Amino acid sequence: MMDLFKFFSKDNGTSKKVAKERLKLVLVHDRTNCSPRFLEMLKEDIIKVISDYVEIDEVGLEIKLTTTKRDFDEQSVPALVANIPIKKMKERSR
C-alpha cells in the first residue's frame, strides 16, 4: 500500500536531489570564496574571449562551480564547468 502512495506522489525524490545539489553548490561557493558576482564577472570575461573565435548562444550558456576528484589522489577539488553552445565558427585573419 505504501508503494502506491510513493507512485502517485509528486516528489518521487526529486526535491531531495535538488536540495542536495543546492547544498553542494553553496558549499563549493563557500569553500572557494566565490561570490555570485564574481562568477558573473568570470562568465562575462569568458564570453568576451570566446566570442572572438566563435558565435555562441549566450542564452544557453551555463557556467557553474562544482567539485571533482583529482586523478592522482582522489581528493575533491573545486571545478569550473562550462557548457557553451556554439552557433558557428568565425573566420579570423591575423
UniProtKB/Swiss-Prot annotation:
Q: Name one GO biological process term.
A: cell division
Keywords on record: Cell cycle, Cell division
Q: InterPro entries from the xrefs? A: MinE, MinE_sf
Pfam families from the UniProt entry: MinE (PF03776)
Q: Which Gene3D superfamilies match?
A: Cell division topological specificity factor MinE
Family statement: Belongs to the MinE family.
Family annotation (HAMAP family): MinE
- Functional description taken from the UniProt entry: Prevents the cell division inhibition by proteins MinC and MinD at internal division sites while permitting inhibition at polar sites. This ensures cell division at the proper site by restricting the formation of a division septum at the midpoint of the long axis of the cell.
Which protein is depicted?
Answer: Cell division topological specificity factor
Gene, per the UniProt record: minE
